[in-house]
């Protein structure tokens, strides 16, 4: 299984002081050496990664670059100019802390944007909710790749197997009934497996990501139809204590098959 290392949160730390440290390009070199792909989200509001970050990483790194971006003309034109290996189209809301759900596949610009990127020899992935309907739509839109949003799975795992329910970060809508949480967790894991199988049957390459960490990744790794995981925040958080290289290598060991 391949690991895409999302280095957005290195940029978050840099932007907190509006300085050039930590150096995102240095992080990209480490991710390129020890991971399989560099994933970078250039948001409309440029809250962390900047245009020059993407340009430098594409210019100087040998690894495949997976650019996450919204259906924004300015950023799509940047992608067409710089030509990352892949563009993963994601939804985006200015007020969100992180990407909260899958892409709306009924967007009028979507098909046209996919065609433009593919005509420039850029692979296109769609970041979608794990639903059979969205997988069928992705196939009809002629995307080559899908990335299943694992956020709900990750939230359920946290609620079940950590103390988050007793902290300020608890998701109250999940409730605290362990039996109910366990049933939801098992159902969501089965759903991810079903969706991954459906995507593979339709000829799509299947990735997964969002909220995956060192404690919850193993069950997802067992879904053999998923060929790639894109993981960022948990790796960067671990790197504070172990260093980025060790954090990546530890995750690589966990996702070995």
UniProtKB/Swiss-Prot annotation:
Reaction(s) catalysed by this chain's protein: 3-amino-2-oxopropyl phosphate + 1-deoxy-D-xylulose 5-phosphate = pyridoxine 5'-phosphate + phosphate + 2 H2O + H(+)
GO CC annotation terms, alphabetical: cytosol
Transmembrane segments: none
Alphabetical list of Pfam families matching this protein: PdxJ
Catalytic center residues: 41 (proton acceptor), 68 (proton acceptor), 210 (proton donor)
Site (Transition state stabilizer): 147
Binding locations of 3-amino-2-oxopropyl phosphate: 6, 17, 211, 232-233
Keyword entries, A-Z: Cytoplasm, Pyridoxine biosynthesis, Transferase
GO biological process: pyridoxine biosynthetic process
EC number, UniProt record: 2.6.99.2
GO-annotated molecular function: pyridoxine 5'-phosphate synthase activity
Binding site for 1-deoxy-D-xylulose 5-phosphate: 8-9, 43, 48, 98
UniProt keyword annotation of Transferase present: yes
Transferase keyword on record: yes
Pathway of action: Cofactor biosynthesis; pyridoxine 5'-phosphate biosynthesis; pyridoxine 5'-phosphate from D-erythrose 4-phosphate: step 5/5
Function: Catalyzes the complicated ring closure reaction between the two acyclic compounds 1-deoxy-D-xylulose-5-phosphate (DXP) and 3-amino-2-oxopropyl phosphate (1-amino-acetone-3-phosphate or AAP) to form pyridoxine 5'-phosphate (PNP) and inorganic phosphate.
Family affiliation: Belongs to the PNP synthase family.
Subunit field text: Homooctamer; tetramer of dimers.
Name of the molecule in the record: Pyridoxine 5'-phosphate synthase
Organism the protein comes from: Campylobacter jejuni subsp. jejuni serotype O:6 (strain 81116 / NCTC 11828)
């Amino acid at each position: 299984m391949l690991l895409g290392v999302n280095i957005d949160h290195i940029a978050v730390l840099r932007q907190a002081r509006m300085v050039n440290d930590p150096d995102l390009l240095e992080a990209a070199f480490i991710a390129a050496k020890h991971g399989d792909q560099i994933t970078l989200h250039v948001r409309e509001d440029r809250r962390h990664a900047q245009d020059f970050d993407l340009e430098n990483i594409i210019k100087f790194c040998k690894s495949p670059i997976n650019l996450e971006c919204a259906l924004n003309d300015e950023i799509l034109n940047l992608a067409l100019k710089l030509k990352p290996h892949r563009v993963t189209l994601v939804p985006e809301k200015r007020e969100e802390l992180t990407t909260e759900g899958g892409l709306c596949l009924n967007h009028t610009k979507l098909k046209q944007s996919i065609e433009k990127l593919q005509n420039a020899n850029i692979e296109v992935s769609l970041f979608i909710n794990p639903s059979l309907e969205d997988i069928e739509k992705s196939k009809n839109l002629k995307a080559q790749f899908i990335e299943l949003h694992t956020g709900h799975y990750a939230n359920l795992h946290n609620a079940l197997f950590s103390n988050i329910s007793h902290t300020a970060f608890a998701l109250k809508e999940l409730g605290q009934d362990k039996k109910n949480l366990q049933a939801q967790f098992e159902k969501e894991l089965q759903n991810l497996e079903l969706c991954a199988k459906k995507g593979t049957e339709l000829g799509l390459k299947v990735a997964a990501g969002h909220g995956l960490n060192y404690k919850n990744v193993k069950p997802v790794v067992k879904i053999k139809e998923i060929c790639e995981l894109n993981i960022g925040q948990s790796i960067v958080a671990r790197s504070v204590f172990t260093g980025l290289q060790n954090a990546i290598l530890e995750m690589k060991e966990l996702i070995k098959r």
